[in-house]
A protein has these predicted regions:
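Short acidic/glycine-rich loop or secondary-structure boundary segments that cap or lie
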Residues: 37-38, 42, 58-61, 78, ...
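Helix-adjacent hinge/juxtasegments
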Residues: 49-91, 95-99
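Active-site neighborhood of phospho(di)ester-bond hydrolases with catalytic His/Asp-centered motifs
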Residues: 5-7, 26-32, 49-54, 79-81, ...
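Conserved beta-sheet core of the metallophosphoesterase superfamily
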Residues: 49, 85-145
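Beta-strand-turn-beta hairpins that frame and shape the catalytic cleft
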Residues: 1-4, 69-78, 116-122, 144-145
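N-terminal active-site segment of His-dependent metallophosphoesterases
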Residues: 1-48, 56-69, 74, 135-138
Length: 145
């Protein structure tokens, strides 16, 4: 199963995302969506699981949860924006969600892929929206096998 992982769009969905996510089976959005229209556009590509972030308005918060826990292709996955942990770290996320095998988060705008305790994959796809903090926009692809 091929997952598209995105976060921090802040109301901007770049055209490049459509090329990168063209053949994904599911899209996971880790918050700071910015507008419900972003989810509508992503849903045209694949099913979407999303969470809200600290900058999302009440329309977005009414539609998606703060944390999503789901099982895809036999893996226990948690999606959270991460702002509830201040400046989220892989260790803090693992401590909060000890049953997860994969934890996806956003908020920091910094891409990261790491393994915690040799058992839990923690991924931050970076920010896909407007460029901030001198970091280039990014998204991620996660292949489940």
């Amino acid at each position: 199963m091929r997952l598209g992982v995105i976060s921090d769009t802040h109301g901007l969905l770049r055209r490049e995302v459509f090329d990168v996510f063209r053949e994904v089976d599911h899209i996971l959005h880790a918050g700071d969506i910015g507008s419900l229209s972003i989810l509508t556009e992503l849903e045209a590509l694949a099913p979407v699981t999303a969470v809200y972030g600290n900058t999302d308005d009440w329309d977005v918060r009414a539609r998606v949860p703060q944390v999503a826990q789901l099982q895809l292709d036999g893996f226990e996955i948690v999606v959270a924006h991460g702002d509830q942990f201040g400046s989220p770290t892989p260790d803090a996320l693992y401590a909060a969600f000890p049953d997860a095998e994969i934890i996806l988060y956003g908020h920091t705008h910094k891409p990261l892929l790491t393994l915690v305790d040799l058992v839990v994959t923690v991924m931050n796809p970076g920010a896909a929206g407007r460029r901030r903090f001198d970091i280039l926009p990014s998204v991620g692809i996660l292949e489940l096998e």
